[in-house]
């Protein structure tokens, strides 16, 4: 949010940017706004209302600096970039509301899964290995991904990526003091890596999506059953096999492939 925003109530009459209507970010921010007694609208926000608008993540920091929006919710490192440029601050971390929530996932064509499962398995193995590397070698990952890195994987500065992947303890303590982190006992990371799509997460995702304001035609959600959707959308065979290699379950801190969902505003 902008530096002058200290509470959700300060966002009434303003615009908040989201990356996509069907994003985890939209779900979480609407839950936050509703708890604060604020209504979501798509245009002309009045008192007690907040306008949500879809915006490319790369445009969000500039829009915040220009005071075109009061805040945004999106994946890193754009939040850290706003902090680094002193145009924004963290009001709340999404992982402090929905514990261990997923952000991104990997999609495969059914044709590939059916016709070349070995190739699919190799792709998933590589993704799991990369996640394990990034989880345990955070500073090195920041350097590899930075614009200063040999392959220039991202346009982001190494300092910004380090703030995301391996923030200084004093900075983390500041977040606890300001209330950006309210569940310190969850021991959440600003960004973490975990490759398994838990059934409980997927069910809650669909359930909350059905409660969320979405632009456009979305009546198809009326007939979607959370439990059935969670079962049918994910083929976990490949990631389960990948996790059985070389003690990767313990590398990700997984004792089983079952988990209870935790959502607390």
Residue ranges and their predicted role:
Residues 53, 106, 195:
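Residues that recognize and position ribonucleotide moieties
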Residues 202-265:
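Conserved C-terminal helix/tail region of periplasmic/extracytoplasmic solute-binding proteins
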Residues 46, 59-161, 165:
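Pocket-lining segment of extracytoplasmic ligand-binding domains
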Residues 2-84, 98-102, 203:
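Bilobed "Venus flytrap"/periplasmic-binding protein-like clamshell domains
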């Amino acid at each position: 949010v902008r530096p002058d925003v200290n509470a959700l109530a300060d966002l009434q009459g303003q615009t908040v940017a989201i990356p996509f209507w069907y994003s985890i970010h939209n779900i979480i921010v609407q839950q936050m706004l509703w708890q604060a007694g604020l209504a979501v609208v798509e245009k002309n926000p009045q008192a007690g209302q907040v306008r949500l608008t879809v915006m490319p993540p790369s445009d969000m920091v500039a829009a915040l600096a220009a005071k075109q929006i009061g805040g945004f919710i999106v994946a890193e490192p754009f939040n850290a970039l706003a902090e680094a440029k002193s145009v924004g601050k963290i009001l709340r971390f999404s992982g402090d509301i929905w514990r261990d929530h997923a952000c991104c996932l990997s999609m495969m064509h059914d044709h590939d899964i059916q016709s070349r499962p070995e190739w699919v398995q190799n792709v998933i193995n590589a993704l799991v290995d990369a996640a394990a590397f990034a989880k345990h070698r955070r500073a090195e990952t920041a350097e590899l991904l930075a614009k200063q890195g040999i392959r220039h994987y991202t346009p982001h500065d190494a300092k910004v990526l380090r703030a995301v992947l391996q923030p200084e303890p004093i900075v983390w303590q500041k977040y606890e003091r300001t209330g950006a982190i309210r569940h310190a006992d969850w021991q959440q990371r600003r960004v973490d890596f975990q490759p398994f799509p838990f059934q409980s997460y997927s069910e809650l995702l669909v359930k909350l999506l059905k409660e969320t304001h979405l632009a456009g035609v979305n009546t198809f959600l009326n007939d979607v059953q959370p439990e059935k959707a969670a079962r049918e959308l994910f083929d976990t065979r490949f990631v389960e096999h990948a996790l059985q290699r070389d003690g990767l379950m313990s590398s990700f801190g997984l004792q089983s492939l079952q988990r209870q969902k935790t959502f607390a505003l």
